[in-house]
Amino acid sequence: MVMLDTLANALTTIYNNEVRGNKEAIIMPASKLIANVLRIMQKEGYVGEFEYIDDGRWGKIRVRLLGRINKCGAIKPRVSVSYRDLLVLPEHLRRFLPSKDVGILIISTSQGLMTHKEAIQKRVGGIAIAYVY
């Protein structure tokens, strides 16, 4: 089976386990992008600790869930956003968050992954890859 979007698969796994009320989720395969997105989600308080498990093939990530995620997912197609777009949140980005101050958009910038709030502070644009609220 071919897996086309590992980030979308990881976020769907987290959301499904959160809806079921599970306390942890196992994400496979693991990647640096998924680990960086989880680090941002952990810093914002959406997930707890996570650890990499080497299984000899692709690796797995075990994530402790805190029950604070209402919805999360990958943004497809990836949307390019400028600094000015982040200030106003245009319609094609507004549909991912329930309100301007609720939730986060995860942006891939030239300075690494960050939330849309950090991107506004640093005055950089990038590509929106995921949302969490």
From Swiss-Prot:
PROSITE patterns assigned to the protein according to its UniProt record, in alphabetical order: RIBOSOMAL_S8
A GO cellular-component term linked to this record: ribosome
Gene Ontology molecular function terms on file: rRNA binding; structural constituent of ribosome
Keyword field: Ribonucleoprotein, Ribosomal protein, RNA-binding, rRNA-binding
Gene3D superfamilies documented for this protein: 3.30.1370.30, 3.30.1490.10
GO biological process: translation
Subunit: Part of the 30S ribosomal subunit.
Function: One of the primary rRNA binding proteins, it binds directly to 16S rRNA central domain where it helps coordinate assembly of the platform of the 30S subunit.
Similarity annotation: Belongs to the universal ribosomal protein uS8 family.
Protein name: Small ribosomal subunit protein uS8
Species of origin: Ignicoccus hospitalis (strain KIN4/I / DSM 18386 / JCM 14125)
Gene: rps8
